[in-house]
Structures are given as C-alpha cells and as structure tokens.
Regions:
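Phosphate/NTP-binding elements of NTP-utilizing enzymes
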Residues: 1-202
Length: 202
C-alpha cells in the first residue's frame, strides 16, 4: 500500500515491523524509480537513522545473494550523527533531515516521518511537508504521449499509538475518513499492541 497510496500512516507497537517495512519500501522505491529523493525525519536524528541503518547493517549484509544484489545498486553510504545518506547508482537517494527550522531547504519526492507523534505538528506543516515541491521527473514525461502521467509526491507517517488528546489522533481520524473516499489515495493501518505481546516482542 505504500506504493499505491500518496498518504500512508502505520500505527503499531514495538516489534511490529515499522522500521523494517519502511526501510524495505525505501530500497525498492529507489531501485525501481530512478532519481527518487526520500527524506527521513524524526524527533531525533538517531531515531531517523534507524531506517538507514536497517538498510546498511541488515539488508546489505544478512541476506546472501540478495544483499550482494543490493550492494551493487548502492554506490555510497554514510550514517552518522551529522550526515546520513544512501546513494543509488540510478540517481536515487535516501537521507536523514532535521525535524526543526534548521532543516529547511531540502527537497524530496517522498517524506517519511518516523515516530511522527513526537515531532511538532507546526514543524511538520511548515518545514517538512514543504520539502515536497516538484515531483519526480522520469524521462518518459519528455514523450508527449505520456506527458500527462505525472507522479504525485508521497507522505508516510509511522508511529506507535498515543493519547486521544494528542494531535496525532486527529490526523489518524482524518486519514480514516479519506481512506473511505475512493477518489483519494489515503491508507491507514493500526495494529493492536496485543500482537507484540502474543509474539513475545514486548
């Protein structure tokens, strides 16, 4: 659904695959859609780095020939406190941005906010969402026959659930309403914490 939706929200407790699934989406998207720009943000850079570390320390090392193939697609990686970026041979990249006023100026086709409930709503609306200016410009748009097939930018929100009094609950309700509207490409998924307990993940 991350591929199909322009607005995606995943609410789940610890151990339910938020980081794994989003990192996997980022890799697949960057490989299949050249020159994709993905910005990852969270309340702290350490938390945002987890998505990139899942790629560099897990996907690129622990899956045999699959990891070999992935390493061939990636030309550069750097995941540190001040700089975190993964660059692909086809011009795509994933980088971590600061979720504050100092993070202004970045540009992206996909905005991924991990643990979004911990990020200030004003920062999301006035800084992070402003990254999504121009959509990806694939070469097929140069052909008049396909010039109308513009891609939409994407927003992805991941978090554990929080109090109903918090603004994130209102955002989740809005996503639920829009999910039911067939003219809009919204998706929201909420998994109960009991799943983590049953599988001994909490």
């Amino acid at each position: 659904m991350m591929m199909c939706s322009n607005f995606f929200m995943y609410l789940a407790a610890r151990g339910q695959g938020k980081t794994f699934l989003t990192a996997l989406f980022c890799v697949v998207r960057c490989i299949l859609f050249p020159k994709t720009k993905i910005c990852v943000a969270s309340a702290t850079r350490t938390q945002a780095n987890e998505v990139l570390l899942k790629i560099t320390d897990d996907f690129m090392k622990n899956y045999g020939w699959g990891s070999d193939n992935l390493r061939r697609e990636i030309t550069y990686t750097s995941v540190g406190a001040n700089k975190a970026v993964i660059e692909f041979a086809n011009g795509s990249w994933i980088k971590v941005v600061t979720a504050s006023d100092s993070g202004r100026g970045s540009r992206a086709n996909i905005l991924l906010i991990d643990e979004f409930r911990m990020v200030d709503l004003d920062t999301i609306n006035t800084v992070l969402r402003r990254f999504l200016t121009a959509p990806r410009q694939p070469n097929y748009l140069n052909n008049p026959k396909y010039a109308h097939l513009l891609e939409r930018n994407k927003e992805l929100y991941m978090s554990s659930a929080w109090y109903k009094s918090h603004w994130s609950f209102d955002k989740a309700k809005a996503y639920t309403v829009n999910l039911l509207d067939e003219t809009k490409k919204y998706f929201i998924c909420g998994l109960p914490y009991q799943i983590s307990i049953k599988e001994n993940l909490l």
